[in-house]
């Protein structure tokens, strides 16, 4: 068994992209080559980061099993699948764990396991693409039903050919989006005090924006008189969304009386939503900062489900 600590193998962003680092990283060079390949294909940095951490967990498990990447078989992957189902780790109740006892979570949720298996499958498909003599050990299942060759024209012409699914996928229950009811949404919104936070919540609830989309907005992306916003979503795809008149008024008030003109160094940014106080005042609001804002207001309002995405889900439910 490899004697390895968490510091021997970890994930970091060196500026060139997400990669495994540490003394043990030399044993898993294939992973870093795969992550670089994803970056070259213009996968979003968040996707590359997620793959990096999923493969980090797999590589740490392999080290504990005294197994190299080149020795992985289908039987190895089945044992890892069992490990994901029975592993215990420190955590808190949430959608990513099955149960929790004495401060420790037991077993990853199906979505987490499937995401990890997708990363592993992609890794070995990448290896097989470079070296056809090294086939992927991931067992393939039946292909998903999609349009036949004769059907893939006209409106269906964009559909890809069916791809086989992995036999290692865990059955994943399909759940409806969990939004907030009217009382919960009102209680959460009433707890916000700053114009910035009210505008952010309004864009999520009434325009259906994701957290990342809100944070990526520039001042010029919002047309307040016409009530439109140009939003950059997943895959850098742009779309124009309507902005409620009340939310537009909140944004205008925020711009006039609350938004900082520059940071402590005098640097100016086009980002719409900025840090309001502290040493980072005037700098773009980060995902961590936004989560901290919502965490504070969940506690203040007593709406335990008041996460940023819950507001977007509330928008989806209301417009369904």
Q: Whereabouts are the PLM-identified features?
A:
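Active-site/catalytic core of tyrosine-dependent DNA strand-transfer enzymes
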Residues: 245-303
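Short, basic (Lys/Arg/His-rich) helix/loop patches that form interaction surfaces
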Residues: 241, 291-320
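Basic, Lys/Arg- and aromatic-enriched nucleic-acid-binding interface segment
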Residues: 172-211, 237
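Conserved tyrosine-mediated DNA breakage-rejoining catalytic core shared by Y-recombinases
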Residues: 207, 212, 216-250, 260, ...
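N-terminal DNA-binding module of tyrosine recombinases/phage integrases
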Residues: 1-41, 176
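Flexible interdomain linker/hinge and immediately adjacent N-terminus
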Residues: 78, 133-187, 232, 276-281
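Basic, Lys/Arg-rich DNA-contacting stretches centered on the C-terminal catalytic core
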Residues: 101-105, 169-171, 191, 225-247, ...
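N-terminal core-binding DNA-recognition domain of tyrosine recombinases/integrases
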Residues: 32-46, 56-155, 187
């Amino acid at each position: 068994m490899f004697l390895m600590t968490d510091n021997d193998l970890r994930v970091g962003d060196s500026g060139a992209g997400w990669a495994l680092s540490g003394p043990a990283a030399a044993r898993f060079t294939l992973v870093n080559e795969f992550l670089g390949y994803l970056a070259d294909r213009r996968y979003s940095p968040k996707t590359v980061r997620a793959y990096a951490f999923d493969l980090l967990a797999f590589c740490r498990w392999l080290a504990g099993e005294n197994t190299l990447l080149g020795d992985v078989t289908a039987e190895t992957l089945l044992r890892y699948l069992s490990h994901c189902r029975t592993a215990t780790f420190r955590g808190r109740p949430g959608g990513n764990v099955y149960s929790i006892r004495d401060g420790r979570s037991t077993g990853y949720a199906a979505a987490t396991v499937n995401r990890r298996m997708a990363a592993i499958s992609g890794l070995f498909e990448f290896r097989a693409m470079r070296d056809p003599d090294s086939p992927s050990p991931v067992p393939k299942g039946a292909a998903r039903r999609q349009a036949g060759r004769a059907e893939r024209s006209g409106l269906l012409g964009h559909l890809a050919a069916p791809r086989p699914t992995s036999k290692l996928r865990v059955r994943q229950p399909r759940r409806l989006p969990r939004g907030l009811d009217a009382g919960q949404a009102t209680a959460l919104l009433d707890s916000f005090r700053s114009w910035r936070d009210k505008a952010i919540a309004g864009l999520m609830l009434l325009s259906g924006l994701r957290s990342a989309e809100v944070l990526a907005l520039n001042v010029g992306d919002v047309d307040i008189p016409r009530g439109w916003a140009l939003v950059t979503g997943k895959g850098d795809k742009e779309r124009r969304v309507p902005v409620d008149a009340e939310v537009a008024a909140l944004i205008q008030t925020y711009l006039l009386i609350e938004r900082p003109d520059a940071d402590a160094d005098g640097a100016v940014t086009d980002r719409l939503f900025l840090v309001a106080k502290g040493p980072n005042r005037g700098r773009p609001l980060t995902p961590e900062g936004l989560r901290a804002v919502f965490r504070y207001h969940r506690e203040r309002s007593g709406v335990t489900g008041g996460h940023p995405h819950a507001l977007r889900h509330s928008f989806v439910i209301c417009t369904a």
